[in-house]
């Protein structure tokens, strides 16, 4: 069974996957319950496959999302989809040279454009060059970043490709292809490619 909760007005759940009609389905292909904001609180592995991500999906503090090599995640344009790892959360996206993990637009090939969806945001507890704790991340979502743990670990990004991201939530406040905020040295970043972003790649 899915275990639900809330943080303020935002629903939380220990499962990520649903059907198109928002039905709970541990083998579904839609990431998120269809709400604009959704907090994942748990540990889950996305098996190799193709998924549609809807809305702003937060990987909450203490939660771990693992994505298998060869997986394709398409960001929904209507809901400005974005995957946001909060401080204390982890994303284990460990692709391979022959089976990278791809985040891309849900638009048909030939119709994809920069800014079709949000992007990836990774927030940690390390010090930042602003010297500010709990600093608001660029781009619009609620998440803050910054602490004093320079060895903080936000997970693994290896052989990951991000395409057509950078939706402008507000004027001049686009998400980068991948946004890093106060990410610590315990995080593994290796062989990343960002293409056709509407804002900065990183």
Task: For the regions a language model picked out, list residue spans one by one.
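Beta-strand/loop edge motif enriched in small/polar residues
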Residues: 1-201
């Amino acid at each position: 069974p899915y275990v639900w909760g809330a943080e303020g007005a935002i629903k939380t759940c220990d499962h990520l996957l649903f059907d198109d009609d928002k039905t709970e389905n541990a083998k579904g292909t839609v990431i998120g319950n269809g709400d604009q904001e959704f907090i994942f609180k748990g540990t889950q592995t996305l098996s190799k496959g193709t998924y549609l991500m809807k809305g702003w999906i937060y990987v909450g503090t203490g939660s771990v999302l693992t994505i298998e090599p060869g997986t394709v995640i398409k960001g929904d344009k209507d809901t400005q989809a974005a995957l946001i790892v909060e401080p204390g959360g982890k994303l284990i996206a460990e692709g391979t040279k022959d089976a990278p993990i791809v985040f891309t637009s849900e638009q048909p090939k030939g119709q994809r454009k920069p800014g079709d969806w949000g992007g990836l945001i990774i927030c940690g507890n390390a010090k930042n060059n602003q010297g500010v704790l709990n600093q608001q991340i660029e781009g619009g979502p609620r998440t803050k970043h910054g602490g004093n743990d320079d060895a903080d670990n936000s997970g693994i990004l290896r052989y990951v490709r991000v395409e057509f991201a950078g939706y402008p939530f507000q004027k001049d406040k686009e998400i980068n292809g991948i946004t890093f905020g106060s990410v610590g040295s315990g995080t593994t970043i290796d062989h990343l490619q960002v293409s056709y972003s509407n804002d900065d790649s990183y």
